[in-house]
A protein has these predicted regions:
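Short, basic, alpha-helical segments at the C-terminal edge of helix-turn-helix-like DNA-binding modules
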Residues: 62-68
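Hydrophobic alpha-helical connector segments
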Residues: 59, 73-117
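N-terminal intrinsically disordered/low-complexity leader segments
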Residues: 1-9, 20
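Charged catalytic carboxylate motif
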Residues: 13, 67, 83, 87
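Helix-turn-helix
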Residues: 13, 21-55, 59
Length: 120
């Protein structure tokens, strides 16, 4: 018997695929149709969960902030070179995971006022 995918899982899959595609090709180089095709879902299904591409970007940025928070919280505990190395490694690891943000930051901020308000 086939298991039914829950709407929450579909939204998670959309975000995972979007992140991978945005990181690989840059956010401007990825259409919602490309994301739908990658997931083998209809564009309407994608738009049900994320009505606009900026909604995807905002959701991914929220994930980035969540991933970054524990790393930044550890900063005051850095007392030795080894701690600093680990802190920087962790910081760069999170930034690499969401590298599309930095790749196209100016364009994202000029188009997306919600993101601009969160960043600036």
């Amino acid at each position: 018997m086939a298991t039914k995918k829950t709407p929450r899982r579909t939204a998670e899959r959309i975000l995972e695929s979007s992140l991978a595609l945005f990181n690989r090709f840059g956010e401007p180089g990825v259409s919602t149709n490309a994301i739908s095709a990658d997931l083998k879902i209809s564009p309407g299904n994608l738009y049900y969960h994320f009505p606009a591409k900026d909604d995807l970007v905002n959701a991914l940025f929220a994930q980035y902030e969540q991933a970054l928070e524990p790393v930044l919280d550890a900063a005051p505990a850095v007392a030795h070179v080894e701690d600093a190395w680990f802190f920087l490694h962790s910081l760069f690891e999170v930034n690499w995971q969401y590298r599309f943000v930095f790749r196209n930051l100016n364009e994202l901020l000029s188009r997306n006022r919600l993101l601009e308000a969160r960043v600036l």
